[in-house]
Amino acid sequence: MHVTPLRLIFMGTPDFAVPSLQAIVDASLPVEVVQVVTAPDRPRRKKNAEAEPTPVKSLALQLGLPVLEVEDVKDPGFAEAVRRLQPDVIVVAAFRILPPAVYGAARLGAFNLHASLLPAYRGAAPINHALIEGERESGVTTFFLQRQVDTGNIILKKSTPINSMENATQLAERLSQIGAEAVVETLRLIAEGTVEVSAQDESLVSKAPKLTRENTRIDWNQSAEDLHNFIRGLAMRPTAWTTLGGKNFKIFQSAPAPAVPATSCGKPGTMLIEGGCLYASGTDGWIEILSLQLEGKRPMDAGEFLRGFRAESGVLFGS
């Protein structure tokens, strides 16, 4: 029996969304991708560099899919363009906050792929905040869009354990693959008409606000474990930062340092150089700093930093 494919619009921009689009195309689903919506080309590595397509646009062009670049999702013209396509379903993965005039155009609904186990970590930076908080489990959620951000009825969840040394970049890569599986499963349920949703429990809500210059600065007045979680939660971008000698100092990678000799931690943020390794103190112990970047310099490992720059034990980070 011939089944008319569902007309699908995919909306996404960064690397995180790429596996989902690829999975939709590769899966044996009764869907037709009638439009891919993404952000406009922009310089993405350095200021004043040549504009580059988004990762999603690059893949869409490779796959021969039509692409629409949108600057302002609230522009009435965008909503009209979506309506003209007569979508059955809209899939959103790491895109923008859509107005009802856009997501309401989908006959069977619009759903979002979110990189947390909702209602935990609602917001713009769920992966980062889960790691910063020391969570041992993360995952993805698909849910139907409604007016309040990240509050819609849940379609399905997929969970995964978090390794204690895993950073935000690594976890994002894993969750993008798990998320692609979730998107395909969700579409299959929608196509079959077998979706069963559940409301989010508001008593379990936690927030994952946007990362800023202010909330990515290292506060050394916390435990060594919390410092390590903060650093890996922001690696490799936007990166945890502090100051040293009045200059910005980024820390990309750290490790717990239980084997550091029983030296008094001193004031939180104290630097210790021992055995060719670089350490910094928290309130109850040490972390080892493994890779870093001084203001105006390229990223380097701690060994290179110690060989090339004057550094002494007892100096305070954050100064």
From Swiss-Prot:
Binding site for (6S)-5,6,7,8-tetrahydrofolate: 116-119
This enzyme's EC code(s): 2.1.2.9
Presence of keyword Nucleotidyltransferase: no
Keyword Transmembrane attributed: no
GO-annotated cellular components: cytosol
Keywords of this entry: Protein biosynthesis, Transferase
GO molecular function: methionyl-tRNA formyltransferase activity
Pfam families for this protein: Formyl_trans_C, Formyl_trans_N
UniProt xrefs under InterPro entries: Fmt, Formyl_trans_C, Formyl_transf_N, Formyl_transf_N_sf, Formyl_transferase-like_C_sf, Met-tRNA-FMT_C, Met-tRNA-FMT_N
Principal EC category: transferase
Domain of life, per lineage: Bacteria
Catalytic activity: L-methionyl-tRNA(fMet) + (6R)-10-formyltetrahydrofolate = N-formyl-L-methionyl-tRNA(fMet) + (6S)-5,6,7,8-tetrahydrofolate + H(+)
UniProt xrefs under CDD domains: FMT_core_Met-tRNA-FMT_N (cd08646), Met_tRNA_FMT_C (cd08704)
Bilayer-crossing regions: none
Protein family membership: Belongs to the Fmt family.
Function as written in the Swiss-Prot or TrEMBL entry: Attaches a formyl group to the free amino group of methionyl-tRNA(fMet). The formyl group appears to play a dual role in the initiator identity of N-formylmethionyl-tRNA by promoting its recognition by IF2 and preventing the misappropriation of this tRNA by the elongation apparatus.
Name under which the protein is recorded: Methionyl-tRNA formyltransferase
Organism this protein belongs to: Chlorobium phaeovibrioides (strain DSM 265 / 1930)
